[in-house]
């Protein structure tokens, strides 16, 4: 069992250490009103890959097992996973470009489709499928890790992404932000 905790610990450590670097590079990119380089984008995916590995291992082995009915956990978890994947995919499809979806094309602000109800549906989709994975595994540690990621993503959007989008798109973004909530909102 020590190998499991070591693997989860290393994954969390790599996520944190790479996150410090990645978010500082994102800040530098946003300060220049630039776009994500392929290197930065790859590091972003590696960083979150290690995070996902920690959540998946924690869930797969039921670390810090929560006494929830197994049928409820499986059913509810799979529903959350499917909903999360659909929301994530819908957000990506609305961009109509992988480059735009990954921050490499900033030619226009996307406010249509699922973006009428959330300014960050891709993050919401990830949150749902991660919650589903944690629920299926009934892992308390996975839920703690998800809570940490929610804090990180909220800080990222409020401190880095939103000021950048406001500088980039100006009044168009301010109007959009006044109509649509950061996470989930009813259309205003």
Language-model features: locations:
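Membrane-anchoring alpha-helices and their flanking helix-loop junctions
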Residues: 1-109, 129-164, 168-188
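Active-site-proximal inter-transmembrane loops
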Residues: 104-126
